[in-house]
Amino acid sequence: MASKLLRKLAYPTLPVKGKIYDPFSKFQQNLYGGSKTEAGNNKIPKFGHKTRRVWIPNGHSKWLYSNVLEEKFHLYVTSRVLRTIDKEGGLDEYLVKSTPSRLKSLGLRGVELRALVLHKLGAKNPILEKLPSDSGAQKRYLEKVKDVVLKLNRSKKLYQQIKSLVGKERSVNTSV
């Protein structure tokens, strides 16, 4: 029982909390850096008439190369995110950097790519590092962590999708 839970929780864990209202929107499926379509009014100064208008993010279709995954990804990115990727030193560095605002603005696609990059890099998992050696304590610890991970990952369905993207799980030695 404990080893099954351990394999489920081994990787990936998503770092973003909160509810996603529209998971299939273009803002979740691409790297928009948190920017979305805004609506408002244009006001004519002389007469004070208002007209409705929409401001759309400055998005571009780009092929971005990941050095770690050795693969190109076709993504829509805003010019601001593109400048940040250049400043960070590449797509992998942009995805791996874990500032709270960056993690919130990645979107679902960004989080999936981040999980793939971290898995390929073999990043240490804090869940596995704190695993007790006693089997009874291990079971209680994993049950407690399972609830937290599922809350962080927002839903079981999304967790399963990302788990299938990562592919074969790392074999974990439970006698840590």
From Swiss-Prot:
Gene3D superfamilies: Ribosomal protein L28/L24. GO terms for molecular function: structural constituent of ribosome. One of its GO terms (cellular component) is cytoplasm. It comes from the Eukaryota. Pfam families: Ribosomal_L28. Residues 1-8 form a transit peptide. Transmembrane segments: none annotated. One of its GO terms (biological process) is mitochondrial translation. Disulfide bonds: none annotated. Its main location: cytoplasm. It is found in: Cytoplasm; Mitochondrion. Keywords: Cytoplasm, Mitochondrion, Ribonucleoprotein, Ribosomal protein, Transit peptide. Belongs to the bacterial ribosomal protein bL28 family. Component of the mitochondrial ribosome (mitoribosome), a dedicated translation machinery responsible for the synthesis of mitochondrial genome-encoded proteins, including at least some of the essential transmembrane subunits of the mitochondrial respiratory chain. The mitoribosomes are attached to the mitochondrial inner membrane and translation products are cotranslationally integrated into the membrane. PANTHER family: 39S RIBOSOMAL PROTEIN L28, MITOCHONDRIAL, LARGE RIBOSOMAL SUBUNIT PROTEIN BL28M. Component of the mitochondrial large ribosomal subunit (mt-LSU). Mature yeast 74S mitochondrial ribosomes consist of a small (37S) and a large (54S) subunit. The 37S small subunit contains a 15S ribosomal RNA (15S mt-rRNA) and at least 32 different proteins. The 54S large subunit contains a 21S rRNA (21S mt-rRNA) and at least 45 different proteins. This is Large ribosomal subunit protein bL28m. The gene is mrpl24.
